């Protein structure tokens, strides 16, 4: 199943940023970037599902270092090309559910548009808990059709299908804050903030701490 996910997203690496803007518009990605830019004192950061690096740059200004990871070699190649010459960021292939990182290695873990497209997302949250220091921060943002009105929701789904085709069977397009909160509590995180951002299209933005 890991190879299936890697192949699904890797084939869109060259057009991913433009595809994303086509599907969800300009405003919601900008809203996520703004929220990320406002996160302070991130310290040593690991990003899971960095993709082409669209959101990664927002992490570099307020952190000591960023390890940006993805399962797709094609996505990582695109991201490395974007960040040539930036000293505090490295890229590597990693599975967010089972990594080689030591326990309590990071101050902050970030997952942008990942939690709703992976199978058994609790496993990834448990791994984040393992590699975060006590009191470490977890930041999650994911596009969601939850709370969207009917016509914009249908439009977003149609644009997704046009660009990327049928999603993987465990894709959760209507991830809610309640559902994610249950998973985070099971993984022993304390939620600090959870909100829906965006206008016509929406994203769930959440910050939690490791107990």
Identify the residue ranges that each predicted region occupies.
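A short acidic, Gly/Pro-enriched loop at the edge of an enzyme's catalytic core
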Residues: 97-109
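A short glycine-rich, Lys/Arg-flanked "PGG" loop and its adjoining helix->strand segment in the class I
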Residues: 122-134
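Core SAM-dependent methyltransferase catalytic element
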Residues: 187-189, 193-211
């Amino acid at each position: 199943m890991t190879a299936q996910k890697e192949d699904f997203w890797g084939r869109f690496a060259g057009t991913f940023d433009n595809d994303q803007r086509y599907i969800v518009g300009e405003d919601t990605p900008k809203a996520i970037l703004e929220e990320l830019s406002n996160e302070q004192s991130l310290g040593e950061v690991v990003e899971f599902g960095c993709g082409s690096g669209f959101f990664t740059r927002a992490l570099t200004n307020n952190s000591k270092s960023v390890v940006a990871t993805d399962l797709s070699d094609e996505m990582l190649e695109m991201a490395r090309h974007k960040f040539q010459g930036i000293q505090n960021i490295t890229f590597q292939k990693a599975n967010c559910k089972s990594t080689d990182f030591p326990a309590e290695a990071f101050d902050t873990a970030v997952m942008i548009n990942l939690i709703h497209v992976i199978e058994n997302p609790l496993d990834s949250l448990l791994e984040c808990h393992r590699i975060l220091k006590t009191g470490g921060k977890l930041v999650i943002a994911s596009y969601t059709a939850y709370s969207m009105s009917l016509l914009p929701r249908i439009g977003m789904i149609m644009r997704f299908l046009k660009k990327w085709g049928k999603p993987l069977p465990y894709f959760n397009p209507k991830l809610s804050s309640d559902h994610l909160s249950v998973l985070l509590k099971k993984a022993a995180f304390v939620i600090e903030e959870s909100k829906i951002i965006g206008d016509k299209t929406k994203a769930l933005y959440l910050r939690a701490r490791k107990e």
